[in-house]
Amino acid sequence: MSDFMKSLSKIAIPVTLQSMLQASFSIIDQIMIGQLGEVNIAAVGLYGNFSLIFSVVIGSVGTVAGILIAQFTGADNEREAWCSLNVSLLCGALLSALFLLAAGGFPAQILQLYTADGRIQQAGAVYFKTVAFAYLPMALSTILSAWLRCKEHAAVPFWASLGAVAANTGLNYLRIFGKLGFAPMGVQGAAIATLVSQLLNSLLILLGFAVCLRRDGSHPQWALHFERITLWAYGGMILPILLSEFLWSLGQNVESAVYGHLGTANLAAYTLTCPIQSLIVGALSGLSAAAGVMVGKQLGKKAFGDAYRDARRIMLTGLVGAIGVASLLVLFAGAYTGLYRVDADVQALGKVLLVVFALYAPVKVENMILSGGILRSGGNTRVIMIIDTIGTWGIGIPLCLLAAYGLQWGIVGVYALLTTEEIFRLAVSLVIFKRRSWMISL
């Protein structure tokens, strides 16, 4: 095995497994809650849509942390790497508090934005109030994981996720259905299981982080002031990502609101496909993380030729992997939707939606690697903001509204049309990649 493949595997495989395990949090909840009927499926799905905003926002903080830590590690500047971690943790704590206040204090108002079904609102409010407390441990896990990957300890977040998923599965079984003497709690039981699992995940990552520091002989530095860059430069990197990711996730919520107004059956069909979509993307997300770390380190060393070469290899690997995974999804889409105790028409709609997703999967994965890893590794995040904003609000949302309210299409047609904006993203990203203007050493 070449040095390139060893480095890629060391980062990509643990990150991929971790992403798939994290996606399984949602799958386990959905399948078990699916035994309780369509209303509860939709309620948990709507929480997932709202939490997507937090996930992408805190993910953007973790992305900037990864960009800086990778480059400063490549440049052998430990102080700046620690400063990057400290500032990112502070940002993560502030964002977590804001989302906790929103989801924990105003769940009914949030749910009314998604659906007019009072049953879904009632079930969703119960779920929101409990799981809202998971935001802080999620932020801690995300940012510490960025450090561990850049320091070649990507296996730590994976093992933490494995323990958390095991806990989530067991607690779901006990609390949702009332096994081994526990009272059945339904959707609230799933919420408790998810919260406890996220707390366990962050605790295990924190312990692993401490062990790795000791093994590496590294000592924490509490600086909050950069020497190589300014806080304004940090803000200049994080704000475009925050804005673009927030607008993208807001767009996802607009799309979900459109799905919700297409009827409960359509919303349930879309919701039951979300976990498997997350799992498929997670199966190849390690390549995006590896691209950010590997290319970022090369840029930190000012080895621009090696950075471009590694980026191309990772893109090719992602394309081959996406085609293979998409083919499997087409074959087993019906088997997956059959796991849910819902009406046959909901299962049929879900199967077709998964096939449409599979057709777009190679484009989605290449966008993930390019936009989420390669192009951002140089720190110029503004161009990604422009691409994402135009793609979501200039193409995706208008097409979604046109298909749903203008053409009166069903869920399959609406989803298929709006997803064409992924093609625009890829075309523009490839042009920027080939021009090499993204290759910047901080």
Q: What residue spans do the PLM features occupy?
A:
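Helix-terminus/linker motif at the lipid-water interface of multi-pass membrane proteins
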Residues: 20, 24-42, 111-118, 174-185, ...
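Residue-level hotspots within pore-lining transmembrane alpha-helices
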Residues: 17, 21, 25, 54-58, ...
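Short alpha-helical transmembrane segments in multi-pass integral membrane proteins
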Residues: 1-15, 69-136, 182-239, 295-360, ...
